[in-house]
Amino acid sequence: MPTLAQRATALLNVHPSHQFRRDRWFQIRYDLGYAAAGLAVLALVATGVVSPLFGAPAGWWLAAFPVALYVAIAAHLLVHNAGHGSFPRPWNRLAGELCGVLIAVRFVGWTLIHVRHHKYSDDRVDDPHPNFPSFLRTAIHSMLQVERQLMKAYYVQWGDTPENRAREQMRARVSYATTLLLFAAWGALLGPWFFVAVFLPAQLGAALFVIHFNWVTHNGHVGKDFAPVDQDTGWFWLGNRLFAGIYMHATHHERPYLFHPLFRNTPPRADAARDVLTAKSA
């Protein structure tokens, strides 16, 4: 019988995409665990065991916003890299989970969506975030596609049956509720004013940044020839230095194991030679 420590170690060394392929109930159990954690945080704050970090608005919050925005964008980047197994084990799972909670979308959902982006890149039906000449249309389409694409991923793995469709409808409701609970937990921890004035705008700004980066690195701003491209001039040059080569997207699609695509000739680590998303190995 494995000990609690052994179970924790095993969990930290497995990638969530592997758990998804082994257990048809995995996503629901996973989200229910985070929902319970969110409820626990809310209870701790409500009972006074934990106090909110910030109170009334203060002038220094203006300086805090760009820091919060940078952290939120970096969290998206690190969840992405953990999805590709770019960190050494067991830190890879830990980084993915922590950063996934920071942006409330969670590691598993982020990863499963990104699997489909690599597999169906620029396919208007199956890419979760295909690009259009209009950035606004691209942004709205991307935000509305998340649950639909998660359902498609499930049907590909487990079959498109009435039973599985009912299960996915339930999972989607659990997912929405869990996201709301995590945001509520952040609001309780940070305090309502800081949550509304700094945290939420930073989350929205980071989401739009990620959508925009994908748009310009698939020629969305050009309006034709939608495909991954590398960008490293002007503001893109700065973005690559601030966010680990984020705009070198063609290189990333070619060598997804790279933590920093600017350094394209970096050999993969022995434990990262497989790419867990594009299924180059198990």
Model-derived segments and spans:
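Short, contiguous alpha-helical
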Residues: 250-257
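Divalent metal-coordination and catalytic microenvironments
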Residues: 80, 114, 212, 218, ...
